[in-house]
Design a protein with these regions (language model features):
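Secondary-structure edge/capping motif, primarily at the C-terminal ends of alpha-helices
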Residues: 73-87, 118, 188, 247, ...
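Conserved aromatic-histidine-acidic binding/catalytic patches
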Residues: 43, 50, 54-57, 88-103, ...
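Helix-loop junctions and short alpha-helical segments
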Residues: 65-70, 76, 84-104, 108-161, ...
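Long, low-complexity or tandemly repetitive, helically biased scaffold regions used
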Residues: 57, 68-84, 204, 210-212
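Amphipathic alpha-helical coiled-coil segments
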Residues: 48, 52-69, 100, 226, ...
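Acidic, Ser/Thr/Gly/Pro-rich intrinsically disordered interaction regions
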Residues: 1-48, 136, 141-255
Length: 255
């Protein structure tokens, strides 16, 4: 790392210590399983241990990236030379921004996967002829989570919370960054333009080419969007906790 970048990174570290973050942490070790359970529940217990921890890790990771981007926002606004600013953005800002923008979709998907598995296991308390017919991991979608979770009161409150994570509003506000990043060319962060030419096919099949651009995502506009998503993820975690506690309450009575 050259001297100029090192000096800028020190500014970032200093700026980060001064940030008063609104990003609360998702909790750990919040549930209590019965001391004695049948071996039948080993799968549920192991899944719950991993899923609750990793969901919290993912949400807290998003919170850290938001804090880092907030600090970088205060640093780059004081860099006047555009070439120097671009170098800092490429080196430090882009990695955090790219991960942060993608994380809400990741977290939503992990919720869907985790809830489907946990509710499927917990359904053993409700179904006398329980069948282990959950789809394979690679094919668990939201509709599958609905199917295996809809008999639980907690899920009825969790589902609308999940629907606010990485939703169409977020997709539009970030210029469809996640989809374009993985399949085409995503918007730039702070500086630069993409999609200078767009191919359009009309309803009549007529093809046209449109000259234009997609402007960069500025941190000043991106950070409130990410903070809202982080809050949505935390709200969903609260509902997830309620669902799990509902599971545990029933499991404790039956087994």
């Amino acid at each position: 790392m050259n001297g100029k970048l090192l000096a800028v990174y020190k500014q970032f570290l200093d700026a980060r210590t001064k940030i008063s973050s609104n990003c609360q942490l998702a909790p750990y070790d919040w549930y209590s399983l019965p001391d004695k359970l049948s071996r039948l529940w080993i799968g549920y217990c192991k899944m719950l241990s991993e899923y609750s921890r990793e969901l919290a890790n993912s949400i807290n990771e998003l919170g850290r990236y938001i804090i880092n981007l907030e600090a970088w926002k205060s640093v780059i606004k004081n860099i006047d030379d555009e070439d120097d600013k671009y170098e800092v953005i490429i080196e430090f800002v882009n990695p955090f921004a790219t991960l942060a923008i993608n994380l809400p979709y990741v977290i939503r998907s992990r919720y869907i996967y985790s809830v489907a598995h946990l509710c499927h296991q917990a359904n053993m308390t409700k179904q006398k002829k329980w069948i282990d017919n959950l789809p394979i991991d690679e094919e668990i979608w939201f509709q599958d989570t609905d199917k295996y979770s809809n008999s639980w009161r907690g899920y009825k409150k969790l589902k609308p919370a999940l629907e606010k994570i990485s939703n169409k509003k977020y997709q539009s506000a970030t210029y469809d960054f996640r989809n374009k990043y993985n399949h085409r060319y995503s918007p730039k962060i702070e500086l630069g333009m993409t999609e200078l030419v767009k191919r359009k096919v009309g309803n009549d099949g007529k093809v046209s080419y449109i000259i234009g651009q997609t402007n960069p995502l500025k941190l000043i506009q991106l950070l409130p969007i990410l903070e809202e998503q982080h809050a949505n993820c935390l709200k969903a975690f609260e509902k997830f906790q309620n669902l799990v506690n509902e599971h545990i309450s029933v499991i404790s009575q039956v087994y």
